[in-house]
Structures are given as structure tokens and as C-alpha cells.
Amino acid sequence: MNRQKVIAIDGPGASGKGTVAARVAAALGYDYLDTGALYRLTALYAQKQGVEWHDEENVSALAKKLPAVFSGNRILLDGEDVSDGIRTEAIGMGASAVAQWPKVRAALLQRQRDFLTEKGLVADGRDTGSVVFPQAELKIFLTAESKIRAERRAKQIGIPCEGFTFERILSDIETRDEADRNRKVAPLKQQPDALLLDTSRLTIEETVKKVLDWYRKV
């Protein structure tokens, strides 16, 4: 089997995989792909077009012609900067909703694969190692306890790690975990050839170092 110059990092929402993947890519001089952003963009685009997330046919049609442009750290949708707009909890739930549809996943699959060049790629998502880049040189399943993930998200948006808003964040994370694990197409799970990395007690720096150490041994 010919291995691809890819590090595939999969895991649940708010596990820190995006931050880790971006830093690993920077350290190696590789490109970085947040596959989840494409599903978030699809959910947001559907919302803007008045298409319900449960409408597989029309959502997949939008996914095929998704007018998205990745420019540095910014993401444009139909010319509008939506870099922050796609990161809301509501759009995260929308991404999980549209990701359950086979036609939507098929529409976005080749677009994700097109990000790979000779330069090398670090990709994060929920099925990057199992579906998008099954021949990746290194596959990692990165996770953390749900409460830890909720605390990290709360700190990220500047709210206390207690109270109603925090409990809502925790509930949203657990709800999305359940949906991702139980969807019929490409459910979220650790693949047999993926290394497990629990970051509950690790800093970002420690996690990045662990990934780089593993990659150098491939």
C-alpha cells in the first residue's frame, strides 16, 4: 500500500484537534485542512439559502457548488468572511446534521482530497483517517473527557466553567458526540490503525510534541 504524506487526526468536537493539527502542520511546513469546516460551511450555506438541514437532496446540491474560498486563516463563503460565523454551537450542530447524509459526504469527499499536494498535509475531522485519507502515514484519534472539552470551549469564549451557559455547552457537546457516533455513514470511532491520544491531562504543547514524536517514528 502506498502511503500518503498525510497526518490524519480524528476525534470528537472541542477535543482540540484543530489547534493541534494546525500547529503540527506549521512545525512540519505542511498544509492544514479542517475537514469539519466544509460541513460547517455547508450547514451555514443551507441556512442562508433557506434549505432545511434534513433535506438531503437540496443540501447535497448546495454542497456540490459550495462557493467557499480558504484564504490563509480566513474562510469566505460567497464572498463573505464567515471564519467566526461557522464556529458557533448552532452551526456545529448543523454540521453534524448535514454530515449524516451520504450524498453530502460524497459531494465534499473529493474536495477534501484535493487539498493534498506534494508539500504534505495535516487534516483533522471525524473520518479523515478512515474515509478521506485511508492511506495516511499517521492516523490519530484525539479525544478528551466531555467536561474537559466543555471547560476548554468555555474558556475560549470567555465564560465561567459553571452555570447555565456552561451546562448548555456541555450538553451540546454530549449531544453532538451521540449524533456523530451513531450516524449510519462514517460514524465517529477510533479506527484499528489509529493511535489513541487522550488530551484530558495534556497541554496543547505536550500534545503537539507527542504527535510530532510519533510522526518521526513512522
Swiss-Prot record:
Keyword Transferase, does the record have it?
Answer: yes
Annotated family: Belongs to the cytidylate kinase family. Type 1 subfamily.
Compartment list: Cytoplasm
Name of the protein: Cytidylate kinase
Q: Which UniProt keywords apply?
A: ATP-binding, Cytoplasm, Kinase, Nucleotide-binding, Transferase
The record's annotation in CDD domains points to: CMPK
Q: What is its EC number?
A: 2.7.4.25
Question: What's a BP term from Gene Ontology annotated to this protein?
Answer: pyrimidine nucleotide metabolic process
Q: Tell me where it mainly resides.
A: cytoplasm
Binding, ATP: 11-19
GO MF entries: ATP binding; CMP kinase activity; dCMP kinase activity
Q: Which reaction does it catalyse?
A: CMP + ATP = CDP + ADP; dCMP + ATP = dCDP + ADP
Key word Secreted present in the record?
A: no
Source domain of life is Bacteria
GO cellular component terms listed in the entry, alphabetical order: cytosol
